Regions:
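N-terminal small-residue-enriched
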Residues: 1-242
Length: 242
């Protein structure tokens, strides 16, 4: 998956399920729940050992950068997932108090007339050590996908199906013919545990979305995501007629 598709994968299957207010049930009647439980932090192997996910509002060029969140908490880079192990949630001061868990500075409001709630900010996958050429060269049979076209995920942010605009066959370590309408599906934990290669800094792109919605009344904010290209093994892929 190329970075412009990875940002959706991060957003939907890491970002939303790790929001602590959602885990505590606050979004149940609007946007759903989370397959993650409060007791999972510090023990759940969320992905393979190649998965390192950081919350970092201090990066100037990303969409959701700040020095303090809207509760006045200083913002720092924090690992949410290190070597695949789930460490901490996306939870601000109030959710931390309610749960007893250590979170991050992510209480954000879209305006003066909305309360701060737990939101993503800059949520990134840390680069690995392989170039795009090395990753492609290590794949016997697969497909390169880029540019999101469609998305569907259940209200616990667990089972998902995503489609891409661009697909290109990989055979014996080489890019081959183009396919159309490639899709893939999976279950969040299983999917991230099948992460088998992470691109280096040369594949890393800073992207994001300006319109992530959450809360009642609704709040729309900017969210930053940065990611290298990533390889996943044993994924259910369908569509993609040549």
């Amino acid at each position: 998956l190329m970075p412009d598709q990875m940002i959706l994968q991060i957003h939907e299957s890491i970002g939303h399920p790790l929001e602590l207010d959602r885990i505590l049930g606050d979004e149940r009647n609007y946007a759903g729940t989370s397959f993650v439980k409060a007791s999972d932090f510090g023990s759940l192997q969320y992905g393979s050992k190649l998965l390192n996910v950081t919350f970092d509002p201090t990066i100037p060029e990303e969409l959701a950068s700040y020095r303090f969140d809207d509760d006045g908490t200083p913002a720092y880079k924090e690992f949410l997932i290190r070597e695949g192990l789930l460490l901490r949630p996306l939870g601000g001061a109030l959710s931390q108090f309610r749960s007893g868990l250590e979170g991050v500075a992510n209480s954000r409001a879209c305006g003066w007339n909305r309360p701060p709630i737990d939101r993503m900010a800059n949520l990134n996958i840390e680069p690995g050590d392989q170039s795009l050429e090395q990753m492609i060269g290590g794949i016997e049979s697969g497909i390169l996908m880029a540019t999101n076209r469609s998305w569907s995920i259940d209200d616990a942010r667990n089972k998902f199906q995503f489609g891409c605009e661009w697909g290109q066959l990989i055979e014996e370590g080489e890019l081959k013919g183009v396919v159309k309408n490639p899709n893939y599906r999976g279950i969040s934990e299983q999917f991230w545990r099948n992460l088998s290669a992470v691109g280096d800094a040369s594949t890393f792109k800073v992207l994001g979305t300006p319109n992530c919605g959450k809360g009642e009344p609704n709040q729309v904010i900017r969210v930053g995501h940065a990611s290298p290209a990533c390889v996943f093994s044993q994924i259910d892929v369908f569509g993609g007629d040549a």
